[in-house]
Swiss-Prot record:
This is Bicarbonate transport ATP-binding protein CmpD. The gene is cmpD. NCBIfam families: ntrCD (TIGR01184). Keywords: ATP-binding, Cell inner membrane, Cell membrane, Ion transport, Membrane, Nucleotide-binding, Translocase, Transport. It is found in: Cell inner membrane. Its EC number is 7.6.2.-.
């Protein structure tokens, strides 16, 4: 596996700004599904080490096993071979130390925004009083700018607001790993950029480890510390890992004026559309 470290026009964050402890470890992971035509290997011998507090984006064409990889980190699926560990413990099932935000929001439509967050807090922190749990839910809705909408149900708010509720719900239980499965893929460009900015601010405050799937190279370059680029499936693997050098806190306008941004962007585009072109992608 090769690592791209391009010329750095902007300084990286200083060591005091970042945690450097290996925290999430994906070791020799393969995933094979039985089919009528025989075993189908989605992922083969995947290795990745993520530092505590690091923000990782994963990109690749449909069928490269991105969601399968996240499902194994989430505990929704198990590797056929290899192991996935968080904090030195092998993942065997879902747990409150790992929370997932999906593209489709996954909110309960008969509950208000506050109740959707409260129910997660109640499940994990049942020992707390009702007042304490409601305060946690309200604080996290306020964090994503939904104080005035917490009594509305999902059908009464926009897609961007629904995703804010999903993010608030995930973070309200203080997970060690936040797993994002294309959380902004269904949103319009303006709302998408707004939520990207909010996500970075929240991540900066919480400093949990983030593993995020995206199909958007620009999104990855703005958000991530490193970009994991997957080869095509079957037998998909990590093709390269790109280190993203822009300092934090990040300024979108400043980044997009930097020549390094376009070098990294063009390299990722070449990886996806030339070296690992996919017929299903326009």
């Amino acid at each position: 596996m090769q690592t791209l470290k391009s010329q750095r026009a902007m300084p990286t964050a200083t060591p005091s700004d970042q945690k450097t402890t290996a925290f999430l470890t994906i070791e020799n992971v393969s995933k094979v599904y039985p089919t009528a035509k025989g075993p189908y290997t989605v992922l083969e011998n995947v290795n990745l080490t993520v530092n505590e507090g690091e923000f990782i984006c994963v990109i690749g064409h449909s069928g490269c096993g991105k969601s399968t990889l996240l499902n194994m980190v989430s505990g929704f699926a198990s590797p056929t071979d290899g192991s996935v560990q968080v904090g030195g413990k092998i993942i065997t099932e879902p747990g409150p130390d790992r929370m997932v935000v999906f593209q489709n929001y996954a909110l309960l439509p008969w509950l208000t925004a506050l109740e959707n967050v409260y129910i997660a807090v109640d499940a994990v922190h049942s020992q707390k009083t009702e007042a304490e749990k409601r305060a946690i839910a309200k604080d996290h809705l306020a964090m994503v700018g939904l104080t005035d909408s917490m009594d509305k149900k999902p059908g009464q708010i926009s897609g961007g607001m629904k995703q804010r509720v999903s993010i608030a719900r995930a973070l309200a239980i203080r997970p060690e790993v936040l797993i994002l499965d294309e959380p902004f893929g269904a949103l319009d460009a303006i709302t998408k950029e707004e939520l990207q900015e909010e996500l970075l601010q929240i991540w900066n405050d919480h400093r949990c480890t983030v593993l995020m799937i995206t199909h958007d190279i620009d999104e990855a370059l703005f958000l991530a510390d490193r970009l994991v680029m997957m080869t095509n499936g079957p037998h998909a693997n990590i093709g390269e890992i790109m280190t993203i050098p822009f300092s934090r806190p990040r300024d979108r306008d400043r980044i997009m004026e930097d020549p390094t941004y376009y070098q990294l962007r063009n390299y990722a585009l070449d990886f996806l559309y030339n070296r690992f072109a996919h017929d299903d992608v326009a």
